[in-house]
Amino acid sequence: MSMEEDIAALVIDNASGMCKAGFAGDDAPRAVFPSIVGRPRHQGIMVGMGQKDSYVGDEAQSKRGILTLRYPIEHGIVTNWDDMEKIWHHTFYNELRVAPEEHPVLLTEAPLNPKSNREKMTQIMFETFNAPAFYVSIQAVLSLYASGRTTGIVLDSGDGVTHTVPIYEGYSLPHAILRLDMAGRDLTDYLMRILAERGHSFTTTAEREIVRDIKEKLCYTGLDFEQEMQTAAQSSALEKSYELPDGQVITVGNERFRAPEALFQPSFLGLESAGIHETTYNSIMKCDVDIRKDLYSNIVMSGGTTMYPGIADRMQKEITALAPSSMKIKIVAPPERKYSVWIGGSILASLSTFQQMWISKQEYDESGPSIVHRKCF
């Protein structure tokens, strides 16, 4: 089907922590908001206050004191469809201010997303929102496109889940995809714990957001953990101060690199899994021996949890230690990697060669939700 020039496709990246949405062809998403739905904890007392039965995104975040907050996407997979529908409704009508029945919609999905989930997404887009056309794409594959490659291994780490996804000539290799249930949310929790050791107690969901901000502004990945610990113990060179919303100033020291270190040493969180470096290596080793060289030289980082300063150098060091000694290793960490899934979607949906890939409303009406497995891979 040919798309009219002026009708831009909508690109929506639904991640565990933040939803990114905008128009195909743009270089950044127009809307980025938390993937949260909040419902009032108590019945409204004041009559006529127009209290809504649910709030989404930033509004839910700002009213969090009176709401129960729920994330409908857990570990990258949608687990609550009613709440998910609210997030999509909010995306179309409040954030982008578009009529979904007028635009093709590209959604993203986690690697290894269950088949029933893809069908449900397809059904909701066509039946609830009456989209004229639809497509669903794997997040890591889009990140790779955004880096200008079609072959490589993507380490995608967001708020809810981390995946290593080997991709060859544009196709992900499902047998070699590995999932780590450790990501930004866990690092925030860990930072809350180690700040408590210093006497700074953060407990509520509202205070957790403060800790997330500390994490994003002050944390970094050390090249050599033991070395950093020594430096921190001997001097105050690594200390930084942070002002809390009430004006109190706290000092953050070795917590700055101890929290992100858990990515390489999950035992810090009480997890028995391999770190991100080892998981990446294991993923490569599950691939055919002939393509490993191409993967080692194209290790692409994506997602907010790969944004720590120093993480690429550390990754280079760790992979070099695991790989064969003659292997050329290249870590690619684009500055815009927080949004590279969305950017890849924007690129894909605006390619002229992609226009025949859309699932049209007509095809959906003829075949039903299972059409998604034939057209999107």
UniProtKB/Swiss-Prot annotation:
GO molecular function, one term: ATP binding
SMART domains in UniProt: ACTIN (SM00268)
Enzyme class: hydrolase
Protein name: Actin-2
Entry superkingdom: Eukaryota
Phylogenetic lineage: Eukaryota, Fungi, Fungi incertae sedis, Mucoromycota, Mucoromycotina
Family: Belongs to the actin family.
Matches recorded under InterPro entries: Actin, Actin/actin-like_CS, Actin_CS, ATPase_NBD
Catalytic activity line of the entry: ATP + H2O = ADP + phosphate + H(+)
Entry EC number(s): 3.6.4.-
Keyword Hydrolase attributed: yes
One cellular-component annotation, GO: cytoplasm
